From Swiss-Prot:
Known function: Endonuclease that is involved in the suppression of homologous recombination and thus may have a key role in the control of bacterial genetic diversity. Acts as a ribosome collision sensor, splitting the ribosome into its 2 subunits. Detects stalled/collided 70S ribosomes which it binds and splits by an ATP-hydrolysis driven conformational change. Acts upstream of the ribosome quality control system (RQC), a ribosome-associated complex that mediates the extraction of incompletely synthesized nascent chains from stalled ribosomes and their subsequent degradation. Probably generates substrates for RQC.
UniProt-listed SMART domains: MUTSac (SM00534), MUTSd (SM00533), SMR (SM00463)
Coiled-coil residue windows: none
Entry's EC annotation: 3.1.-.-, 3.6.4.-
Binding sites annotated in the UniProt record for ATP: 337-344
Domain of life: Bacteria
Species annotation: Lactobacillus gasseri (strain ATCC 33323 / DSM 20243 / BCRC 14619 / CIP 102991 / JCM 1131 / KCTC 3163 / NCIMB 11718 / NCTC 13722 / AM63)
NCBIfam families to which the protein is assigned, alphabetical: mutS2
UniProt cross-references to PROSITE patterns, sorted A to Z: SMR (PS50828)
The name this protein goes by in its record: Endonuclease MutS2
A GO biological process held by the record: mismatch repair
Length: 791
């Protein structure tokens, strides 16, 4: 696009855009790069560049600008290192600055990664920020950014500078004695000055021998001699010697640092290039923010669809945004109408925004605006204010048009201002039509302006061609600068004359002098203008309604999300509270069981039903915890019924049926289960129908304890269960069997790996309610089952 750019950059004022871009860059190399930024015709390259601008804009919005400060171009220093030359302090200080900035930006990038901010389009630059630690450490110890060598560069330099400071103090003390004591009468002024790096006194000429020493200089009149007193001569000599040693040590340090830097030329260059590129891209994002620009949506279909596009160089408070289209339902747009209405600015806006996008810059248009990537952009744009053009201007205009016609292709954009102007109107109009017909055959995208009325019908007679015009406010007698696509320019001469007070009869006569065809065209344009305005107003109203609906939907969704989050938080809090309560109750139940077991081991008499009752309470707590975990609280609440004395109920913690015999409290009852009376809460019982408790039992057994069970079975099958699950079920089963009065039960555990079988045997061995146990006979399962006798 070099040829295209060299011709249109000045006309479209693209150079003013990149000057603004350069001003927003921080480093000198990035500023220079910005001034060289040219649009690209490679779609992939443009998209990549736009992506980078988007990433930096997002970073600027979320985290702020990158920590980059100005540094000088390191390439001259690297060239010197390449030929083994030594660098001075300023050059090494600049390299140290580059490495320090690389470290800072690297940390900045790490923070972006932690915040999960996308940096993929600039990843290669971030990866190049690799600082050689040994070089950085040495430079940090030895040199300042401005090139000053630090005291810490070497122990020798530190000692030398200490000695220099101490010796200088001694010199000043001696000299101060001269200018404040009895010797002041011999001095022209009571000051200490320096000549040739040595401290001297301004002595009157006639007293030059009073101080001894050496005369270093004299005043212009010869009345004052600058004398180095004999008393400080030795100190000054020592000072000069120390300073010479300091210079020598600094020289040695710079040589050492240069040699170390020479080993990392590639790394230094990579860091500098990465910082330059990141600064350059950051400038793009800053320009977008400054202009309130948005990311263009690129397409490969040569479609332009700009919404509320505004010229980026016109005051935002004054510029009028316009919708501009090409390549949708038409490829050629003719903007007709009088001069000074904004036709040229519209062309320039289209061309400049297209150039900006192809340079990877954001555009001054509404979000979602579409642009494409053209191979070339041809433009012939003159001065909008020039109504009459000279023959030489017409020749220049035609010369440009001919070049465009000879080179344009379907992949190009053509912008022509006042096509065919500068010659006889009739010939100019005919020439414009012929040129347009020729250009349209190339299938390029074309936008032209003209004030020839003959072209008004062109858009209606040619395929994929449309008219457009700049709106004019008849009440204010001023252009509105709004583009009206689909409507040709309307002549407003009669309306303006009437508004200004011209005799109505004169205006009417002028209308009568117009031929019927022209009159009909103007009436048609007037109707189209009114219809378009009405349609646009309706569209704007509908758009506002849609935007409000989208906003409301977003607010409602946010509210719903917040509500769901609050509900979830409350559920989690309730779960935590319930877990704490259940853990507390579990400890209480375990303490009861442990106390009972302790009493038994101590020889006390503990009733079996007390132990079982305590275990039942523990089982109840475990089941409540499971219900909470599975979120089945509401299901249990639905099943619960109001109960009262005399109701037949099922006690959930025991899995047994009984009858409520007494109400102990608001939520507490006494239930008779066989001969056993237990205390329960209303949450632990379910009311059952009277007939349910009188069903024929699966197995009815009366024990010596007199307890009858309608639910207990003489067998328990543990096959297929996990180890812990099997032992838990075994414990509960034996409790229920004891309550049911069963004397003998069979535990089916299978053979398998023997884990459950061994676990069962170990459990039975410890349980004091087990009288004896043995494997079942061969015909009843053998070692796959155990017969247990209870006591």
């Amino acid at each position: 696009m070099e040829d295209m750019n060299s011709k249109i950059i000045e006309k479209l004022e693209y150079n003013r855009i990149i000057r603004q871009l350069s001003d927003l860059a921080i480093t000198a190399p990035a500023k220079a790069q910005a001034l060289k930024l040219m649009p690209s015709s490679d779609f992939d390259e443009v998209k990549k560049s736009i992506d980078q601008t988007r990433v930096l804009s997002n970073i600027l919005r979320v985290k702020g600008p990158m920590p980059i400060t100005d540094f000088k171009d390191v390439r001259p220093s690297l060239k010197r290192l390449k030929v083994k030359a030594n660098l001075n302090g300023e050059e090494l200080g600049n390299i140290f600055l580059v490495l320090s900035l690389a470290k800072d930006v690297g940390q900045f990038a790490s923070d972006l990664e932690e915040r999960e901010i996308d940096t993929r389009p600039i990843e290669k630059y971030l990866k190049n920020l690799a600082v050689p630690e040994d070089l950085f450490k040495k430079l940090n110890q030895a040199i300042e950014y401005d090139g000053t060598v630090k005291d810490t560069a070497s122990s020798k330099l530190m000692q030398l500078r200490h000695d220099i400071q101490s010796n200088e103090t001694d010199i000043k003390n001696h000299m101060n004695d001269y200018i404040s004591g009895k010797h002041t009468q011999y001095l022209s002024e009571n000051i200490v000055t320096i000549r040739d790096g040595r401290y001297v006194l301004p002595v009157k000429q006639e007293y030059k021998n009073k101080f001894g020493g050496v005369v270093h200089d004299q005043s212009a009149s010869g009345q004052t001699l600058f004398v180095e007193p004999q008393a400080v001569l030795v100190l000054n000599n020592r000072q000069q010697n120390l300073l010479a040693q300091e210079r020598q040590e600094i020289h040695r340090i710079l040589i050492e640092l240069s040699e170390l830097a020479g080993a990392y030329q590639k790394e230094i260059n990579n860091n500098a290039l990465a910082l330059t590129q990141l600064d350059f891209l950051s400038a793009k994002s800053k320009l977008a923010k400054k202009m309130k620009a948005t990311e263009p949506v690129l397409n490969q279909d040569h479609i332009i669809k700009l919404r509320k596009a505004r010229h980026p160089l016109i005051d935002p408070k004054k510029v009028v945004p316009n919708n501009i289209e090409l390549g949708t339902t038409f490829d050629t747009m003719l903007i007709t109408g009088p001069n000074t209405g904004g036709k040229t600015i519209t062309l320039k806006t289209l061309g400049l925004l297209q150039l900006m996008a192809q340079a990877g810059l954001f555009i001054t248009a509404e979000e979602g605006s579409q642009l494409t990537v053209f191979n070339e952009i041809y433009a012939d744009i003159g001065d909008e204010q020039s109504i009459e053009q000279s023959l030489s201007t017409f020749s220049s205009h035609m010369d440009q048009i001919i070049k465009i016609m000879n080179n344009v292709t379907e992949d190009d954009l053509v912008l022509i201002d006042e096509l065919g102007a500068g010659t006889d109107p009739e010939e100019g109009a005919s020439l414009a039509i012929a040129i347009l017909d020729d250009l349209r055959q190339t299938q390029a995208k074309i936008a032209i302006t003209t004030h020839y009325p003959e072209l008004k019908l062109y858009g209606y007679n040619r395929k994929r061609t449309t008219n457009a015009s700049m709106e004019f406010d008849l009440k204010k007698l001023a252009p509105t600068y709004r583009l009206r696509i689909g409507i040709p320019g309307q002549s407003n001469a009669f309306a303006i004359a009437h508004q200004l007070g011209m005799n109505e009869a004169v205006v009417d006569k002028a209308r009568d002098l117009m031929n019927d065809e022209d009159s009909d065209i103007n009436k048609m344009i007037e109707r189209l203008t009114e219809q378009t305005k009405a349609a646009e107003q309706l569209h704007e109203t509908l758009k506002q309604n849609v935007d409000q609906s989208i906003t409301l939907k977003r607010q409602l969704q946010n509210g719903l999300d917040w509500y769901n989050q609050q509900v979830q938080k409350q559920l989690e809090k309730s779960q935590e509270k319930a877990d704490e309560m259940l853990a507390k109750k579990r400890k209480q139940a375990e303490k009861i069981i442990n106390d009972l077991e302790e009493q038994r081991r101590a020889g006390g008499q503990v009733r079996t039903n007390k132990v079982i009752e305590a275990k039942g309470a523990l089982n109840k707590l475990e089941r409540e915890n499971q219900n909470l975990a599975n979120n089945k609280v509401l299901q249990r609440e639905k099943k619960r019924h109001d109960v009262s004395v005399g109701d037949n109920v099922k006690v959930l913690s025991y899995g047994q049926q009984g009858v409520i015999t007494k109400k102990l409290g608001e939520h507490e009852f006494e239930v008779q289960i066989g001969i056993l009376k237990v205390k329960v809460t209303d949450r632990d019982v379910e009311k059952i129908a009277a007939q349910a408790s009188q069903k024929k039992p699966e197995k009815s057994v009366r024990s010596s304890r007199g307890l009858r069970s309608s639910r207990a079975s003489s067998e328990l099958d543990l096959r297929g269960q996990r180890y812990e699950e099997a032992l838990t079920n075994l414990d509960r089963y034996l409790d229920a069997s004891l309550l049911a009065g069963l004397n003998t039960v069979t535990i089916i555990h299978g053979i398998g790996t023997g884990a459950i079988r061994n676990g069962v045997q170990q459990y039975l061995k410890r349980n004091r309610h087990v009288k004896s146990y043995n494997y079942a006979p061969a015909n009843q399962g053998g070692t796959g089952a155990t017969i247990v006798n209870l006591q």
